[in-house]
Amino acid sequence: MERGEAGLVPVDEGWFVVNAREMEWLAVDGSGAWTSFEGPHIRFEQVGVALNVLGRGDAMAMYHAEETQEDFLVLSGEALLIIEGRERPLKAWDFVHCPSWTEHVIIGASDGPCIVLAVGARRKGVGCATR
């Protein structure tokens, strides 16, 4: 691990243990903050993992669908899931499974932070479709 401007980043493909608070975090107005546990030159080839911290109204992404499976676990707070055109409230410990091409977005709905763990399968050359 190496210290970057915004926290720790992995520098090689070996194993590591790190506290999420020490990782490099990115933030965009309206999208909250997140860390992917990856670095600029290190990318997990098989599975993407991200920890997202959402404020009220922050969207994790655009309303979209992925070619591969995505799963989400709300660790704290509350969120609104929009999935296949339907709304569903989420709370701590709710798990969301999105098979391939399931349109979805998660939006923070708490007065305090909503923390969501996201895990997605990866295949080379695979992207997502946004609407």
What are these regions (language model features)?
Residues 46, 51-56, 65-82, 121:
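Short, conserved beta-strand element in jelly-roll/cupin
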Residues 3-4, 105-131:
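Double-stranded beta-helix
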Residues 1-46, 129-131:
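A short, N-terminal "cap"/entry segment at the start of jelly-roll beta-barrel domains
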Residues 61-62, 81-82, 98, 104-110:
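Short beta-strand His + acidic residue motifs that chelate non-heme Fe in jelly-roll/DSBH
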Residues 71, 85-101:
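Short acidic-glycine-tyrosine-enriched beta hairpin
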Residues 30-37, 50-66, 100:
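Conserved short histidine dyad/triad with adjacent acidic residue
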